[in-house]
Amino acid sequence: MNQTCKVCGEPAAGFHFGAFTCEGCKSFFGRSYNNISTISECKNDGKCIIDKKNRTTCKACRLRKCYNVGMSKGGSRYGRRSNWFKIHCLLQEHEQAAAAAAGKAPGHATGSPMSSPGFGDLAAHLQQQQQQHQQQQQQQHQHQQQQQRHPHLPPLLGYTGYHLPEHFGARHPADAAAAAAALPFFSMMATPQSAFQLPPHLLFPGYHASAAAAAAADAAYRQEMYKHRQSVDSAASAESHSRYTPPTVATVPQQSQPQPAASPIDVCLGADDDVQSQHSHSHSHSQSQSPHTIHTPVAIRATPPQQLLPGLTTASHSSSASPTPSKSQSSSPLSFTAKMQSLSPVSVCSIGGETAAANAAASAAAAAQDGPMDLSMKTSRSSVHSFNDSDVCSLQDEHELAARRKYYQLEAECTTITNTTNSCSSSTSTSSSNSSTSSTEAAVAVKRQKLNPIGGESPPFGGFAVTHNASSAMRSIFVCV
């Protein structure tokens, strides 16, 4: 920067408080303006020379010179702006002042105040200018003239209705310096402030009316968008809940079928035995149901009477539509083959007369399936396959057969021990029979304890063996000798 300080003559650091000053004079003016009561009067009647060497000798004369060069507290109204911006604003002030002075007194000689011969003549000249300016303030057409001569000011300031005040012409730097020198020292603060004031939206950009309105509109928009998003989220959650929640199916109470006094054997199939191959009636109707329907176990009768066949068909349909499986019927993991073999140690032949029509329906249902499936290992109500060596080749069937053989062996031993006990108790005396009976009963109890875990492995068939006798169990099964 090729500028020098207007107060002391040192190289200027920038445009501060309305004038090019160094850092020292800038700091001095900032401190003295706020603490003007601590500055004493000049002892040399205000004739001290302020330069680079003796600028600190007299504070009163230094502050007076700061005012003379145009420094003011209002000069810092621009804030931390560039020097170009500050100088541009100052040049606009000079332009405005020159236009106002030329318009108010055409015939008046506006020579330089520094050409006046004495200090008193300068004061009188400044007073004359102030009086003329006060008269000029009463004219109503001054704002119109300023708007016509300087139409570029409103766009520069960014405020369409902003105009400079009327007493703008009195703030020419030379006139201000002369007026400050003519007044007493402590009356310098009574001088009018700078006329060049920025509009409120430039001084306080965060508090302008339009900015506040824009912020309010943005807040309202954000609130509306938040409400809209909440409504969309609630609708989406309701839709997903209705989509992924299975509908509740009312359980149809099954009407109990009248059972005859001497009912045949009821063999309960678990849900794991007939998930894919049901009996012919339930399999033909399961295609119209949803693929997620849980098939319940079906009570299958070995030799159902002819008059009860329609009733069994309806009962199996209603039970296959109910969604809740029966835990008591599906508790045994044994297959239908092992269950039927547990009833008799000999081979069981299929009943051809009862299964002729059901076999045709099962073959039609198997042909209607989507893909080929091997049904050789599947079981159904309609057909009871004859048992050969290939049906029990799996490891699971071998374990089940071994447990079943042990069960029959232990049961035979218990029967033999019981018979022996009865014969011994009838032939011997009372004392000896009591001792032998007690020992024999202890052995029977041990055998019964061994039988209980084996029978507990298959609760449905253990209970079946207890509740039914051998004659009713083998009523409808043909034994091949």
From Swiss-Prot:
Residues 100-161, 231-294, 308-336, 420-442 are annotated as: Disordered. SMART domains: ZnF_C4. The keyword Oxidoreductase does not apply. Belongs to the nuclear hormone receptor family. NR0 subfamily. Keywords: Developmental protein, DNA-binding, Metal-binding, Nucleus, Receptor, Repressor, Transcription, Transcription regulation, Zinc, Zinc-finger. Its main location: nucleus. It is found in: Nucleus. Transcriptional repressor. Binds to multiple sites in the eve stripe 3 enhancer element. Plays an essential role in the segmentation process both by refining the expression patterns of gap genes and by establishing pair-rules stripes of gene expression. InterPro entries: Nuclear_hormone_rcpt_NR3 (IPR050200), Znf_hrmn_rcpt (IPR001628), Znf_NHR/GATA (IPR013088). Residues 2-78 bind DNA. One of its GO terms (cellular component) is nucleus. Residues 100-111, 127-148, 245-264, 316-335, 420-440 have a biased composition (Low complexity). A zinc finger (NR C4-type) spans 5-25, 42-66. This is Zygotic gap protein knirps. GO terms for molecular function: DNA-binding transcription factor activity; sequence-specific DNA binding; zinc ion binding. The lineage of its organism: Eukaryota, Metazoa, Ecdysozoa, Arthropoda, Hexapoda.
